[in-house]
Amino acid sequence: MKSKAEKSQFSKLVSDNGIWVVLVVLIIFITIINRNFLTPNNAVALLTGESVKGVMTFGVTLAILSKGIDLSTGSVAALSAICSAALCQASTTKLWAGLPTMPAIVGILGGIAIGVIVGFANGWMVAYLRLHPFIATLGTQLICRALCKLITPGPVSKLTPGFRFLGNGKIGPFHMIVIVMIIMFIILAFMLKMTRFGKSVYAVGGNDQAARVAGINVEHTLVKVYIWCSFCAALGGVLLAGRSDSADPANTGLNYELDAIAAATVGGTSQTGGICRPSGVIAGILIMGVINNGMVMMGVNDQMTFIVKGLIIIGSVAFDMRKNAVKK
């Protein structure tokens, strides 16, 4: 009986932390193929490389948790990056001629404000116009990317040192971009576990009608969800601009929404809504980072990497739906 109980506890432990087991197995597999994968320098490169996508994943997580989706995050990141970069150009040839070079904080807040406005629009369309989140955010995705190309046909570059610090700077041995991701994760975890808003998002995602009966303002909750989502996307865009010292209307944030959705889904945020573990989201981000980094180190081309990511998204959603069907 003791043996069976121990086996049951072990099975529960693996089941509850299966995503971390997958991460460890993946790391071991890639390390066997390329021993340079598990080195301190590559670990730092992986973390800094995935930090922006991580921040954006924290936003998408709430949208999925509310039984929605946000396809606009990559384009919102690009629009915010371009606007914030334009405010903080140190070059003599500016995108907006005659505009003085602004302090870094003005550029950062300006870029984030753009994201908040788009997030409000997304939330309003989903909550009050009753548009499906897929349609609403697909529309804003196209609009934001088009606005990027209307604002500037080419990259906005040569940014001020203060602005670049957010993406490239360090505080002691720690990269600023990683610190920002950790802070955003702490905010997400606190929000979901300790605040009324977080509990409302769980309730709306689980059953919006029951949430309404329980006195939750479903519309206000959804608007806040999409504002948070675009806030994270805009912050990600600002980080991208600071890290690369430029913002490109065609390439900045391109397809980042796919990685964010994949990471959130792989991390256990259910596409059916109402289910999310913040620790699982971190594991999902790391898994996607390991795949991205590992594929490069193994010499796999970009198209094959996209195929693998697509299969991961399909597999994760299929597994999630099957698991929920069994529970019902």
Stretch-by-stretch model annotation:
Residues M1-L26, I32, V213-H220, N293-K328:
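Cytosolic-side transmembrane-helix boundaries in multi-pass membrane proteins
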Residues K2-T57, T92-V106, I216, K224:
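Membrane-interfacial amphipathic/re-entrant helices at transmembrane-helix boundaries
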Residues V25-S91, W124-L131, G268-P278, L311, ...:
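Single transmembrane alpha-helix segments in multi-pass membrane proteins
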Residues R35-G49, C148-K149, K158, L192-K193, ...:
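Inter-helical junctions in multi-pass inner-membrane proteins, predominant
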Residues T92-Q141, A283:
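Alpha-helical transmembrane segments within multi-pass membrane transporters and channels
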Residues P103-G110, I117-N122, P173-D248:
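Helix-loop-helix "hairpin" substructures at the membrane interface of multi-pass membrane proteins
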Residues I105, L129, P133-M194, T221-K224, ...:
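Transmembrane helix-bundle core of multi-pass membrane transporters
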Residues A233, S244, D248-G310:
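Transmembrane alpha-helical segments in multi-pass inner-membrane proteins
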